[in-house]
Amino acid sequence: MAPIVHSVEISRSPEDVFAYLTDFSRSSEWQENLVSASVEGGDPLRVGSHVKMTRRIGRSERKMTNEVIEHNPPRSFGFRGIDGPIRAIGKGTVEPVGDGARSRFTMELDFEGRGIGKLLVPLVVRRQARSDMAKSQERLKARLESGGT
């Protein structure tokens, strides 16, 4: 299946948007169903970093780990899940719009299912992710445009 792709324009510079997106200690401020996230060991973000996340899925919380596979400030980052039955593979791109005071953030997201995840990805996960991504990007836009950094 094709990845889920969603974009939003934000009235902030690419540098501001990228910095906020990759500050995982703040990701729960805008990401739908994210309880917490942190870079393992508190190290600076780089290719190979592990990001520990806790997501609310239904009535329970699930822990997962993503590995950073691309990190090109202030333009793009990529990650892949390395544990659990449902593993996300994603890429975020931040592009300047107009004179560079505005940005377009595009997120591409796909999933790899293992075990029961092979059934859940096409039946539930992709639909929920599409909805959550749109809500999250609207929250991101509102947060950054109101001065939240």
Feature-to-residue mapping (PLM):
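Generic structural detector for well-ordered beta-strands
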Residues: 7-11, 38, 54, 67, ...
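Short, highly charged C-terminal tails/helix-capping segments
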Residues: 39, 141-149
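Beta-strand/loop substructures that line and gate deep hydrophobic ligand-binding cavities in soluble
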Residues: 80-135
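Short, cysteine-centered beta-strand-loop-beta hairpins and adjacent loop/turn segments enriched
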Residues: 56-62, 113-116
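A short, structured loop/turn motif at beta-sheet edges
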Residues: 14-15, 42, 69-74, 93-104
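Short beta-strand segments that buttress and anchor functional surface loops
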Residues: 49-56, 77-83
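Hydrophobic ligand-binding cavity/cleft-lining segments
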Residues: 1-46, 139
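Short, surface-exposed coil-to-beta transition loops
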Residues: 3-5, 61-65, 87-91
